[in-house]
């Protein structure tokens, strides 16, 4: 019964220490406590009026976690007041873990835990107990609920859930500078004993760092820790439960601490003198050497700025910082010349860009070194005496004329001769030549300033000893103008002078232009030609600024006397030889008002001095127009009246009858027929084709053969009808065509001699009636039944 005695002792300690308190008063139950047993009395079925002894009854049991004994762990005992110990009562258990974790003796009510329990897995179990009559299988009491708590033991060590840790702290920090706070957790019950009370300590990392035992805050323990001496620290932290007492469980973690850099070190050159060798042919801007100062700091604290201290040759060189390597790159600012100077010496200063004011007292954060540069001799190309040569030559200069020279020298020791030639790419047309030995430039073509005013080409000089070494220079040649063209008036001027002009008035400003040079390059003079200077009506006033004014010399001008004046103006330039030209200006006399504003320069102004106003002239013109209209109307009516007397009525139109007393064909006649063809029908005419109608067949021109009797008239009419059908000049509408042909071979010479026909009885004119109404007159005239009536002939 050792287990039961230990359990009783534990329960006594719990009660005596006040750790367990009654959860629920049960007035129906009686307290039956044995020093070595845990007993829960089930409520009995008694009268409510029966007086019972009051007391506190447990409704919970306790069981130790992690029990490893050979026998099941005794938990407690259930007992009913109705159980008399006769074996008639059966106890049952249900709820969490009933039958799997906990078992009950049905007869005695003893409860046992049949397996090891873990409080961290499940801290308590809720079960229900009931007493049942064995014989009747009926509950003797209502079901009662109770709790079994798993009693914690110190079986879990503290754990750092966030470990391992990484922290940083600036170098040179003072003692007590905050680094990091660590935290360990214990899975044991923090409300029971010291199983979950953790204490921190440092196992490795002293004396550099310290830790607060309760809070786990890590701080620096030494001042002025230098990153350049040691940058990384690994600190081992321990967390122990039970308040750090003996027997407590412990857990550890690692904290990696890095000292961050501060600018506490100045840059230092590893040596005081740097020697560099530079060829004299090094191009401007090229890097000729590198120097480096060392700064043990890191990042931006190690960024260095280099500067050349003013001194010998300092203006020929420059130094910049390479951001990747923090080296000082020395560059060439001006060309070097071995023949001029062979060595240069200057100092370079290196300093930090980002300073920390806390370390100013440590001294200046910069260092100085000396740089010595030796210039190496290089075989160089010739050097021209000028960077650009400008020359001038007159246009039309004879070919072969020397216009200038260039000079290049070899400045190296033991100089070589120089050869010259023109770069063919710049002077493709070969306007110039150069002497290869002397460098003289001459013309190779006749030059014309008006065509090309300026030439730009290059000359190359090479060493005879090394032709690959060449240099180039630009040549600019300006072609000077020879005064070839005389000046002329720049634009045509339309000059007018008022009739009421006064002497001395400027009526026009003229300017001149010269094709030789721009107007700003010459001075022009203006004057009248000698023949116009005699009793001039106008004169020229030279303003001495390449312009002149036309000035009046008379008091008033009359358009009736002279409407236009022609003024010859002589213009001379100032070049040599002097060129001049005579330009004739036309001056028109106009009518102006009193203010000099031109009112009219038209022809009607000539009539104004007669005394007629403009309104009177308009009235006269209207009258003339009306009279002309009346005359035209009268002539038209007369002609219409003559036409009306030609026919008896408008319906009776004799299309083939015309009057022969007309002296000439009217508009209708000339458009409708060719009078020449009618007068000479025997003339062969070309058959014309109409353009708007495609004829089925073309009629070839032929001469009408002479016909006997009256058949020639019929053939004549058929021939004219056919010609009109194919005539392209015929109008696109029906028109009246008249013919003057009376036939050939007739004995009658006129219409008045129709009665004298001797063979009238032999003539057959009945076919005329078949030709339609247009030939009705002829049919009536030559018909057999109707005699000739002289009253019908007009």
Curated annotation (Swiss-Prot):
It comes from the Eukaryota. It is found in: Cell membrane. SUPFAM superfamilies: Cadherin-like. Residues 24-54 form a propeptide. Keywords: Calcium, Cell adhesion, Cell membrane, Cleavage on pair of basic residues, Glycoprotein, Membrane, Metal-binding, Phosphoprotein, Repeat, Signal, Transmembrane, Transmembrane helix. Brain. Residues 55-160, 161-269, 270-384, 385-487, 488-609 form the Cadherin domain. InterPro entries: Cadherin (IPR039808), Cadherin-like_dom (IPR002126), Cadherin-like_sf (IPR015919), Cadherin_CS (IPR020894), Cadherin_Y-type_LIR (IPR000233), Catenin-bd_sf (IPR027397). Residues 1-23 form the signal peptide. Residues 638-794 are cytoplasmic. CDD domains: Cadherin_repeat. Residues 55-609 are extracellular. SMART domains: CA (SM00112). One of its GO terms (cellular component) is adherens junction. Cadherins are calcium-dependent cell adhesion proteins. They preferentially interact with themselves in a homophilic manner in connecting cells; cadherins may thus contribute to the sorting of heterogeneous cell types. This is Cadherin-12. It comes from Homo sapiens. The lineage of its organism: Eukaryota, Metazoa, Chordata, Craniata, Vertebrata. The gene is CDH12.
